[in-house]
Amino acid sequence: MNQEIFEKVKSIVVEQLEVEEDTVTPEANFANDLGADSLDTVELVMALEEEFDIEIPDEAAENIGTVQAAVDYIEKEQAKA
């Protein structure tokens, strides 16, 4: 896992979901572990898109349930660029 991407994702998650930094682990599920509802998830995806200058289609966003999944998706998109 790219540590730089993870740290940026972690920072965004902490800010968007107002959770403690130590609760944001690669395995953390946005809904179950971090308390995100559907609106939080949409806002989180938008923040990730802005930070990493990528587009996350709705179908892809539905499959990003954990911090690790977000990092993996961003790594994949950046590799295409």
Swiss-Prot record:
GO cellular component terms, semicolon-separated: cytosol; membrane
Processing after translation: 4'-phosphopantetheine is transferred from CoA to a specific serine of apo-ACP by AcpS. This modification is essential for activity because fatty acids are bound in thioester linkage to the sulfhydryl of the prosthetic group.
A GO term for molecular function: acyl binding
UniProt keyword annotation of Lipid biosynthesis present: yes
Compartments (UniProt record): Cytoplasm
The Carrier domain, residue ranges: 3-78
Modified-residue entries (O-(pantetheine 4'-phosphoryl)serine), positions: S38
InterPro entries documented for this protein: ACP (IPR003231), ACP-like_sf (IPR036736), PP-bd_ACP (IPR009081), Ppantetheine_attach_site (IPR006162)
PANTHER family per UniProt: ACYL CARRIER PROTEIN, CARRIER DOMAIN-CONTAINING PROTEIN
Stored NCBIfam families: acyl_carrier, PRK00982.1-2, PRK00982.1-3, PRK00982.1-4, PRK00982.1-5
Protein name: Acyl carrier protein
Native organism taxonomy: Bacteria, Bacillati, Cyanobacteriota, Cyanophyceae, Oscillatoriophycideae
